[in-house]
Amino acid sequence: MEGGIRAAFSGLNDVRIDPTGGEGRVLVPGEVELIVYAGPFGTDDGKVIVDALAALGGPQTVQALSVLLSYVLQGSAQGDLEAKCKILTDMGFKVTQSPRATGIEAGILMPMRELAQTVNNDNLMDIVKGALMTCSLLDKYSVDKMIKYITKKLGELGSTQGVGELQHLSADKAAIRKLAGCVRPGQKITKALYAFILTEIADPTTQSRVQSMGALRLNGTGMTMIGLFTQAANNLGIPPAKLLEDLCMESLVESARRIIQLMRQVSEARSIQERYAIMMSRMLGESYYKSYRLNDNSKISYILSQISGKYAVDSLEGLEGIKVTEKFREFTELVAEVLVDKYERIGEDSTEVSDVIREAARQHARKASDKPEPKARNFRSSTGRGKEQEKEESDDDDYPGDSD
Protein backbone atom coordinates (compact mmCIF):
# COMPACT_ATOMS: atom_id res chain seq x y z
CA MET A 1 0.00 0.00 0.00
CA GLU A 2 1.80 3.12 -1.23
CA GLY A 3 1.50 6.83 -0.39
CA GLY A 4 -1.77 7.82 1.31
CA ILE A 5 -2.10 6.19 4.69
CA ARG A 6 1.61 5.51 5.21
CA ALA A 7 2.56 9.12 4.50
CA ALA A 8 -0.24 10.55 6.63
CA PHE A 9 0.64 8.53 9.71
CA SER A 10 4.43 8.44 9.43
CA GLY A 11 4.67 11.11 12.12
CA LEU A 12 2.86 9.07 14.74
CA ASN A 13 6.17 7.87 16.17
CA ASP A 14 6.65 11.38 17.51
CA VAL A 15 3.35 11.61 19.40
CA ARG A 16 4.12 12.53 22.98
CA ILE A 17 2.74 9.53 24.85
CA ASP A 18 4.79 7.75 27.48
CA PRO A 19 6.05 4.61 25.69
CA THR A 20 6.50 2.86 29.03
CA GLY A 21 2.76 3.06 29.64
CA GLY A 22 2.02 0.24 27.25
CA GLU A 23 0.64 0.42 23.73
CA GLY A 24 -1.92 -1.59 21.82
CA ARG A 25 -0.85 -5.13 21.03
CA VAL A 26 0.83 -5.87 17.75
CA LEU A 27 -1.63 -7.89 15.70
CA VAL A 28 -0.02 -11.13 14.58
CA PRO A 29 -2.05 -13.20 12.07
CA GLY A 30 -0.20 -16.33 13.19
CA GLU A 31 -1.97 -16.14 16.55
CA VAL A 32 -5.36 -16.36 14.83
CA GLU A 33 -6.83 -19.66 13.66
CA LEU A 34 -8.95 -19.66 10.52
CA ILE A 35 -11.38 -22.46 9.74
CA VAL A 36 -11.79 -24.02 6.30
CA TYR A 37 -14.75 -26.35 5.81
CA ALA A 38 -13.99 -29.32 3.59
CA GLY A 39 -15.92 -32.22 2.11
CA PRO A 40 -16.26 -33.58 -1.41
CA PHE A 41 -19.08 -32.47 -3.70
CA GLY A 42 -20.43 -34.86 -6.30
CA THR A 43 -22.36 -34.14 -9.46
CA ASP A 44 -25.63 -34.74 -7.62
CA ASP A 45 -24.89 -32.36 -4.74
CA GLY A 46 -26.29 -29.25 -6.39
CA LYS A 47 -29.52 -29.66 -4.44
CA VAL A 48 -27.57 -29.74 -1.15
CA ILE A 49 -26.02 -26.37 -1.97
CA VAL A 50 -29.35 -24.80 -2.96
CA ASP A 51 -31.03 -26.19 0.16
CA ALA A 52 -28.22 -24.74 2.28
CA LEU A 53 -28.75 -21.33 0.69
CA ALA A 54 -32.47 -21.51 1.42
CA ALA A 55 -31.81 -22.57 5.04
CA LEU A 56 -29.81 -19.46 6.00
CA GLY A 57 -31.51 -17.78 8.95
CA GLY A 58 -33.25 -20.98 10.01
CA PRO A 59 -32.53 -23.62 12.67
CA GLN A 60 -29.71 -25.14 10.60
CA THR A 61 -27.91 -21.89 9.77
CA VAL A 62 -24.49 -23.07 10.95
CA GLN A 63 -24.74 -26.30 8.97
CA ALA A 64 -25.93 -24.36 5.92
CA LEU A 65 -23.03 -21.92 6.16
CA SER A 66 -20.56 -24.79 6.40
CA VAL A 67 -21.92 -26.27 3.16
CA LEU A 68 -21.83 -22.95 1.33
CA LEU A 69 -18.34 -22.06 2.58
CA SER A 70 -17.03 -25.46 1.55
CA TYR A 71 -18.55 -24.99 -1.90
CA VAL A 72 -17.06 -21.54 -2.59
CA LEU A 73 -13.59 -22.53 -1.36
CA GLN A 74 -13.22 -25.84 -3.16
CA GLY A 75 -15.95 -26.17 -5.75
CA SER A 76 -15.66 -29.74 -6.93
CA ALA A 77 -11.85 -29.95 -6.80
CA GLN A 78 -9.82 -30.74 -3.69
CA GLY A 79 -6.84 -29.06 -5.35
CA ASP A 80 -8.71 -25.74 -5.29
CA LEU A 81 -9.13 -26.04 -1.52
CA GLU A 82 -5.44 -26.71 -1.01
CA ALA A 83 -4.57 -23.65 -3.10
CA LYS A 84 -6.92 -21.48 -1.01
CA CYS A 85 -5.41 -22.80 2.23
CA LYS A 86 -1.96 -21.88 0.94
CA ILE A 87 -3.14 -18.31 0.32
CA LEU A 88 -4.19 -18.06 3.97
CA THR A 89 -1.03 -19.62 5.38
CA ASP A 90 1.07 -17.32 3.17
CA MET A 91 -0.71 -14.41 4.87
CA GLY A 92 0.51 -15.80 8.17
CA PHE A 93 -2.70 -17.37 9.51
CA LYS A 94 -3.05 -20.78 11.08
CA VAL A 95 -5.55 -22.83 9.08
CA THR A 96 -7.59 -25.76 10.36
CA GLN A 97 -9.79 -27.90 8.12
CA SER A 98 -13.15 -29.00 9.50
CA PRO A 99 -15.77 -31.30 7.93
CA ARG A 100 -18.79 -29.59 6.45
CA ALA A 101 -22.36 -30.66 7.07
CA THR A 102 -23.40 -33.44 4.71
CA GLY A 103 -26.87 -32.09 4.04
CA ILE A 104 -29.86 -30.07 5.19
CA GLU A 105 -32.91 -31.78 6.67
CA ALA A 106 -35.88 -31.90 4.34
CA GLY A 107 -38.90 -29.82 5.30
CA ILE A 108 -37.00 -27.61 7.73
CA LEU A 109 -37.68 -23.85 7.83
CA MET A 110 -36.17 -22.16 4.75
CA PRO A 111 -36.12 -18.34 5.26
CA MET A 112 -34.09 -17.72 2.08
CA ARG A 113 -36.24 -19.91 -0.17
CA GLU A 114 -37.07 -16.99 -2.49
CA LEU A 115 -33.37 -16.30 -3.04
CA ALA A 116 -32.65 -19.99 -3.61
CA GLN A 117 -35.34 -20.13 -6.29
CA THR A 118 -33.35 -17.67 -8.43
CA VAL A 119 -30.41 -20.10 -8.70
CA ASN A 120 -29.37 -21.83 -11.92
CA ASN A 121 -26.18 -23.51 -13.10
CA ASP A 122 -24.74 -20.23 -14.37
CA ASN A 123 -25.29 -18.01 -11.32
CA LEU A 124 -25.01 -20.44 -8.39
CA MET A 125 -21.44 -19.54 -7.41
CA ASP A 126 -22.01 -15.78 -7.66
CA ILE A 127 -25.22 -15.88 -5.60
CA VAL A 128 -23.64 -18.00 -2.87
CA LYS A 129 -20.60 -15.72 -2.69
CA GLY A 130 -22.80 -12.62 -2.54
CA ALA A 131 -24.94 -14.12 0.22
CA LEU A 132 -21.84 -15.04 2.25
CA MET A 133 -20.34 -11.57 1.87
CA THR A 134 -23.63 -10.13 3.07
CA CYS A 135 -23.71 -12.50 6.05
CA SER A 136 -20.19 -11.39 6.98
CA LEU A 137 -21.53 -7.92 7.79
CA LEU A 138 -23.32 -9.37 10.82
CA ASP A 139 -19.96 -9.63 12.55
CA LYS A 140 -20.38 -5.88 12.97
CA TYR A 141 -23.88 -4.69 12.06
CA SER A 142 -26.72 -4.80 14.54
CA VAL A 143 -29.86 -6.71 13.55
CA ASP A 144 -31.83 -3.54 12.84
CA LYS A 145 -29.01 -1.97 10.84
CA MET A 146 -28.64 -5.17 8.82
CA ILE A 147 -32.35 -5.21 8.00
CA LYS A 148 -32.11 -1.59 6.86
CA TYR A 149 -29.06 -2.43 4.72
CA ILE A 150 -30.80 -5.39 3.07
CA THR A 151 -34.04 -3.55 2.33
CA LYS A 152 -32.55 -0.26 1.14
CA LYS A 153 -29.09 -0.98 -0.29
CA LEU A 154 -28.40 -4.62 -1.03
CA GLY A 155 -30.49 -4.95 -4.19
CA GLU A 156 -28.88 -1.98 -5.91
CA LEU A 157 -25.40 -2.91 -4.70
CA GLY A 158 -25.87 -6.49 -5.85
CA SER A 159 -26.89 -5.27 -9.30
CA THR A 160 -23.74 -3.15 -9.62
CA GLN A 161 -21.69 -6.26 -8.82
CA GLY A 162 -23.57 -8.49 -11.25
CA VAL A 163 -25.59 -10.31 -8.59
CA GLY A 164 -29.00 -8.67 -8.87
CA GLU A 165 -30.62 -11.80 -7.43
CA LEU A 166 -29.53 -10.62 -3.95
CA GLN A 167 -32.57 -8.35 -3.93
CA HIS A 168 -34.45 -11.53 -2.95
CA LEU A 169 -32.38 -12.08 0.21
CA SER A 170 -34.86 -12.02 3.08
CA ALA A 171 -34.84 -9.22 5.65
CA ASP A 172 -37.11 -11.16 8.00
CA LYS A 173 -36.13 -10.12 11.52
CA ALA A 174 -36.23 -13.62 12.98
CA ALA A 175 -33.95 -14.89 10.20
CA ILE A 176 -31.48 -12.03 10.61
CA ARG A 177 -31.44 -12.55 14.38
CA LYS A 178 -30.59 -16.19 13.86
CA LEU A 179 -27.78 -15.29 11.47
CA ALA A 180 -26.51 -12.64 13.88
CA GLY A 181 -26.40 -15.21 16.66
CA CYS A 182 -24.12 -17.39 14.55
CA VAL A 183 -21.86 -14.76 12.98
CA ARG A 184 -20.19 -13.20 16.01
CA PRO A 185 -16.54 -12.56 16.87
CA GLY A 186 -14.78 -15.68 18.10
CA GLN A 187 -17.28 -18.10 16.56
CA LYS A 188 -15.95 -20.95 14.42
CA ILE A 189 -18.30 -20.13 11.56
CA THR A 190 -17.16 -16.48 11.61
CA LYS A 191 -13.54 -17.53 11.24
CA ALA A 192 -14.59 -19.66 8.29
CA LEU A 193 -16.46 -16.73 6.72
CA TYR A 194 -13.37 -14.59 6.87
CA ALA A 195 -11.17 -17.33 5.51
CA PHE A 196 -13.41 -17.08 2.44
CA ILE A 197 -13.31 -13.25 2.46
CA LEU A 198 -9.51 -13.23 2.64
CA THR A 199 -9.12 -15.63 -0.28
CA GLU A 200 -11.45 -13.44 -2.35
CA ILE A 201 -9.42 -10.35 -1.47
CA ALA A 202 -6.28 -12.12 -2.67
CA ASP A 203 -7.87 -12.64 -6.10
CA PRO A 204 -7.63 -9.46 -8.23
CA THR A 205 -10.78 -10.46 -10.14
CA THR A 206 -12.92 -10.44 -6.98
CA GLN A 207 -11.25 -7.73 -4.85
CA SER A 208 -13.65 -4.98 -5.89
CA ARG A 209 -16.70 -7.10 -5.13
CA VAL A 210 -15.43 -7.91 -1.63
CA GLN A 211 -14.60 -4.29 -0.96
CA SER A 212 -18.08 -3.22 -2.06
CA MET A 213 -20.13 -5.96 -0.42
CA GLY A 214 -18.09 -7.42 2.42
CA ALA A 215 -14.91 -6.83 4.35
CA LEU A 216 -14.30 -3.12 3.83
CA ARG A 217 -17.76 -2.30 5.19
CA LEU A 218 -16.75 -3.67 8.58
CA ASN A 219 -15.50 -0.73 10.58
CA GLY A 220 -14.77 -3.03 13.48
CA THR A 221 -11.45 -3.70 11.79
CA GLY A 222 -10.23 -0.30 12.97
CA MET A 223 -10.20 1.25 9.52
CA THR A 224 -13.11 3.52 10.42
CA MET A 225 -11.03 5.07 13.19
CA ILE A 226 -8.20 5.69 10.74
CA GLY A 227 -10.69 7.22 8.30
CA LEU A 228 -12.14 9.49 11.00
CA PHE A 229 -8.67 10.70 11.96
CA THR A 230 -7.76 11.34 8.33
CA GLN A 231 -10.98 13.23 7.61
CA ALA A 232 -10.80 15.37 10.75
CA ALA A 233 -7.09 16.13 10.26
CA ASN A 234 -7.62 17.05 6.61
CA ASN A 235 -10.49 19.36 7.53
CA LEU A 236 -8.33 21.08 10.15
CA GLY A 237 -5.34 21.18 7.82
CA ILE A 238 -2.97 19.48 10.28
CA PRO A 239 -1.07 16.18 10.51
CA PRO A 240 -2.95 13.32 12.23
CA ALA A 241 -0.23 13.15 14.90
CA LYS A 242 -0.89 16.76 15.95
CA LEU A 243 -4.62 16.11 16.21
CA LEU A 244 -3.96 12.99 18.25
CA GLU A 245 -1.89 15.02 20.72
CA ASP A 246 -4.84 17.34 21.29
CA LEU A 247 -7.16 14.42 21.94
CA CYS A 248 -4.87 12.69 24.42
CA MET A 249 -6.69 13.71 27.57
CA GLU A 250 -6.02 11.40 30.47
CA SER A 251 -9.27 9.48 30.04
CA LEU A 252 -8.48 8.73 26.38
CA VAL A 253 -4.77 7.90 26.49
CA GLU A 254 -5.23 4.11 26.64
CA SER A 255 -7.45 4.13 23.57
CA ALA A 256 -5.02 6.45 21.83
CA ARG A 257 -2.15 4.03 22.44
CA ARG A 258 -4.10 1.25 20.78
CA ILE A 259 -4.99 3.50 17.86
CA ILE A 260 -1.35 4.50 17.39
CA GLN A 261 -0.26 0.88 17.25
CA LEU A 262 -3.00 -0.03 14.79
CA MET A 263 -2.24 2.95 12.56
CA ARG A 264 1.46 2.14 12.52
CA GLN A 265 0.81 -1.44 11.51
CA VAL A 266 -1.67 -0.54 8.78
CA SER A 267 0.54 2.26 7.42
CA GLU A 268 3.51 -0.11 7.16
CA ALA A 269 1.60 -2.85 5.31
CA ARG A 270 3.12 -3.38 1.87
CA SER A 271 0.25 -5.20 0.17
CA ILE A 272 -3.51 -5.47 0.34
CA GLN A 273 -3.15 -9.03 1.62
CA GLU A 274 -0.90 -7.89 4.47
CA ARG A 275 -3.23 -5.03 5.34
CA TYR A 276 -6.26 -7.31 5.52
CA ALA A 277 -4.34 -9.91 7.50
CA ILE A 278 -3.75 -7.24 10.15
CA MET A 279 -7.35 -6.05 10.06
CA MET A 280 -8.86 -9.51 10.21
CA SER A 281 -6.51 -10.47 13.04
CA ARG A 282 -8.25 -7.85 15.11
CA MET A 283 -11.70 -8.97 14.04
CA LEU A 284 -11.15 -12.69 14.52
CA GLY A 285 -8.67 -13.10 17.36
CA GLU A 286 -10.71 -13.51 20.52
CA SER A 287 -7.93 -12.13 22.74
CA TYR A 288 -7.45 -9.19 20.40
CA TYR A 289 -11.18 -8.54 20.30
CA LYS A 290 -11.34 -8.45 24.10
CA SER A 291 -8.23 -6.30 24.46
CA TYR A 292 -9.40 -3.80 21.86
CA ARG A 293 -13.11 -3.92 22.80
CA LEU A 294 -14.99 -2.27 19.96
CA ASN A 295 -16.38 0.53 22.12
CA ASP A 296 -13.10 1.41 23.88
CA ASN A 297 -12.47 4.11 21.31
CA SER A 298 -16.02 5.40 21.03
CA LYS A 299 -15.24 8.67 22.80
CA ILE A 300 -12.47 9.54 20.37
CA SER A 301 -14.69 8.48 17.46
CA TYR A 302 -17.40 10.82 18.70
CA ILE A 303 -15.04 13.78 18.99
CA LEU A 304 -13.58 13.16 15.53
CA SER A 305 -17.04 12.96 13.99
CA GLN A 306 -18.04 16.21 15.68
CA ILE A 307 -14.93 17.93 14.27
CA SER A 308 -15.73 16.86 10.72
CA GLY A 309 -19.39 17.71 11.33
CA LYS A 310 -18.35 21.35 11.65
CA TYR A 311 -17.38 21.19 7.97
CA ALA A 312 -20.05 18.87 6.53
CA VAL A 313 -23.25 17.69 8.17
CA ASP A 314 -22.96 14.37 6.34
CA SER A 315 -19.83 13.64 8.35
CA LEU A 316 -21.98 13.13 11.42
CA GLU A 317 -23.13 9.83 9.92
CA GLY A 318 -19.93 8.55 11.52
CA LEU A 319 -21.70 8.85 14.88
CA GLU A 320 -24.07 6.03 13.99
CA GLY A 321 -24.11 3.42 16.71
CA ILE A 322 -21.65 5.19 19.05
CA LYS A 323 -22.96 5.14 22.61
CA VAL A 324 -22.20 8.18 24.76
CA THR A 325 -23.95 10.04 27.57
CA GLU A 326 -25.71 13.33 26.94
CA LYS A 327 -23.06 15.02 29.07
CA PHE A 328 -20.26 13.67 26.92
CA ARG A 329 -22.09 14.56 23.71
CA GLU A 330 -22.22 18.19 24.85
CA PHE A 331 -18.57 18.00 25.80
CA THR A 332 -17.55 16.68 22.37
CA GLU A 333 -19.34 19.56 20.69
CA LEU A 334 -17.31 21.99 22.79
CA VAL A 335 -14.05 20.15 22.07
CA ALA A 336 -14.79 20.23 18.34
CA GLU A 337 -15.48 23.97 18.46
CA VAL A 338 -12.26 24.60 20.40
CA LEU A 339 -10.14 22.58 17.95
CA VAL A 340 -11.68 24.23 14.91
CA ASP A 341 -11.09 27.63 16.53
CA LYS A 342 -7.50 26.68 17.34
CA TYR A 343 -6.52 25.74 13.81
CA GLU A 344 -8.65 28.23 11.87
CA ARG A 345 -8.34 31.34 14.03
CA ILE A 346 -5.97 30.97 16.98
CA GLY A 347 -3.20 29.43 14.88
CA GLU A 348 -1.46 26.09 14.72
CA ASP A 349 1.29 27.07 17.19
CA SER A 350 -1.14 27.82 20.03
CA THR A 351 -0.66 25.88 23.26
CA GLU A 352 -3.95 27.04 24.77
CA VAL A 353 -6.20 24.29 23.52
CA SER A 354 -5.35 21.63 26.12
CA ASP A 355 -6.06 24.03 28.98
CA VAL A 356 -9.36 25.02 27.39
CA ILE A 357 -10.40 21.38 27.01
CA ARG A 358 -9.41 20.55 30.58
CA GLU A 359 -11.36 23.52 31.94
CA ALA A 360 -14.39 22.51 29.87
CA ALA A 361 -14.17 19.00 31.31
CA ARG A 362 -14.04 20.40 34.85
CA GLN A 363 -17.11 22.55 34.18
CA HIS A 364 -19.04 19.56 32.88
CA ALA A 365 -17.96 17.52 35.89
CA ARG A 366 -19.25 20.20 38.25
CA LYS A 367 -22.57 20.36 36.42
CA ALA A 368 -22.87 16.59 36.47
CA SER A 369 -22.32 16.42 40.21
CA ASP A 370 -25.60 18.26 40.73
CA LYS A 371 -27.72 15.75 38.80
CA PRO A 372 -27.82 11.98 38.14
CA GLU A 373 -25.56 10.64 35.41
CA PRO A 374 -27.68 10.30 32.24
CA LYS A 375 -28.02 6.89 30.69
CA ALA A 376 -25.76 6.14 27.71
CA ARG A 377 -27.54 6.69 24.43
CA ASN A 378 -27.05 5.31 20.99
CA PHE A 379 -27.06 8.33 18.69
CA ARG A 380 -27.95 7.84 15.06
CA SER A 381 -28.02 10.77 12.72
CA SER A 382 -27.99 11.50 9.03
CA THR A 383 -29.08 15.10 9.53
CA GLY A 384 -26.42 16.20 11.99
CA ARG A 385 -28.59 15.95 15.08
CA GLY A 386 -28.35 13.15 17.61
CA LYS A 387 -31.40 10.97 18.07
CA GLU A 388 -31.85 8.44 20.78
CA GLN A 389 -32.16 4.89 19.53
CA GLU A 390 -34.58 2.60 21.27
CA LYS A 391 -32.97 -0.33 23.05
CA GLU A 392 -33.11 -3.54 21.06
CA GLU A 393 -34.74 -6.63 22.41
CA SER A 394 -33.01 -8.46 25.25
CA ASP A 395 -31.45 -11.26 23.22
CA ASP A 396 -29.53 -8.73 21.12
CA ASP A 397 -28.44 -6.39 23.93
CA ASP A 398 -24.86 -7.64 23.99
CA TYR A 399 -24.29 -7.21 20.29
CA PRO A 400 -21.49 -4.69 19.62
CA GLY A 401 -22.33 -1.27 18.27
CA ASP A 402 -20.80 0.34 15.20
CA SER A 403 -17.92 2.25 16.76
CA ASP A 404 -14.30 1.22 16.81
Curated annotation (Swiss-Prot):
- Underlying gene: N
Pfam family of the protein (one) = Rhabdo_ncap_2
> From what organism does this protein derive?
Viral hemorrhagic septicemia virus (strain Makah) (VHSV)
Q: Which GO terms describe its cellular component?
A: helical viral capsid; host cell cytoplasm; ribonucleoprotein complex; viral nucleocapsid
Listed InterPro entries: Rhabdo_ncap_2 (IPR004902)
What role is this protein assigned?
A: Encapsidates the genome, protecting it from nucleases. If expressed without protein P it binds non-specifically RNA and therefore can bind it's own mRNA. Interaction with protein P abolishes any non-specific RNA binding, and prevents phosphorylation. The soluble N-P complex encapsidates specifically the genomic RNA, with protein N protecting the genome like a pearl necklace. The encapsidated genomic RNA is termed the nucleocapsid (NC) and serves as template for viral transcription and replication. Protein N binds protein P in the NC through a different interaction, and can be phosphorylated.
Give the multimer and partner information.
Answer: Homomultimerizes to form the nucleocapsid. Binds to viral genomic RNA.
What are the alphabetically sorted keywords of the record?
A: Capsid protein, Helical capsid protein, Host cytoplasm, Phosphoprotein, Ribonucleoprotein, RNA-binding, Viral nucleoprotein, Virion
The leader peptide range reads none
Q: Which family does it belong to?
A: Belongs to the novirhabdovirus nucleocapsid protein family.
Stretches that traverse the bilayer: none
Question: Would I find Membrane among this entry's keywords?
Answer: no
Protein known as: Nucleoprotein
Amino acid composition bias (Basic and acidic residues), ranges on this chain: 357-376
Q: Which GO terms describe its molecular function?
A: RNA binding
Q: Where is this region: Disordered?
A: 357-404
Positions with biased composition (Acidic residues):
391-404
Q: Provide the protein's localization.
A: Virion; Host cytoplasm
